[in-house]
């Protein structure tokens, strides 16, 4: 339960009663002007009291899990571990929200309201209270098997079959099998490895290949058509009515976001494990990624959610840990982590606007990283000092840029990815008896950032000029 008490003398409640002088009254959006009276002026509709808001959220859920395990060792050489199970998840969520007008906190919590506050809300289409229910169901069946020969060679396999009511109606879309197969070779378990010890304390080589999946963003729920109630705008409260609108078109084939991943790595230790190094290389192929699909508008809206994209990525991760000093009362350890990633959108079945690509948050375009930033080419100043740019037609222009252009995007200049390509951390832990000090830094680079758009066509005397103005025409 969340309660919000907006008391009588609070700034928010006072704003509903501020109607002087005339300039303030005419620009105060919290006052009410009766549309039924052509000569009306804005009036106060919350003369006394404050506002009380309450938000109730309840959830009833249960989880049922059944598992079985089998472990055995044959002739002290063959180690077998088997694990199987099933899981059922259910969650029902209920939400209610309410706003009460005119609650007099200084008068014994007595409500006093003007009927016009409800008339104002009805004409604006705002809600007085809301109720909402969501239902989530998920079933999963899984199996895992591991075989190891004397701890030297290990093979592991996992299979999972999962279904959820969030995705499409067809069995192919709603249910998905995923799997993982991996293997490891512990070279330090070999008899000949003792010759390399303790300089090389341990060495393991590992590899895996898998198909994994994700249900996608929690906001995507259009495996069935999404229809919401709403109050259409009418010029007066007497003409008001309720209605239904299509929020999102049905996509019965909406399915999981999937990923194939190949991982190869090595785990090694040196100097009696005082130095440990882990190196992993991976290659990923993401497909059936969920995004907006541009439709012909036949269903009433031009966009719906669907599996529209594919992405390829690869990278390397390095982790180095050292025990620099180790005594009875004092120790000093260092950890260094570095990772590099490269990704590229290989398929994108949706349309993109110029505005999306030049926005500072980055956007997706086929053939480029997932969050790429583009720029409109700057062509210098013209003879009267105005900045000029290259437009979508290949012409140099000051005002001819069509930010809604979807077809001709080749004139844009690729600036880079807004996501870092290299990142990691460097930390040191000092421990003396019962005291511990952790000193660490994180770092990232390889990305670009759109500069703050501080330049405007109009400035008042109240505007503070930023330092970027000093070199405003330098490129």
Model region roles, listed by residue range:
Residues 415-452:
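Glycine-rich, aromatic-lined ligand/substrate-binding cores of catalytic
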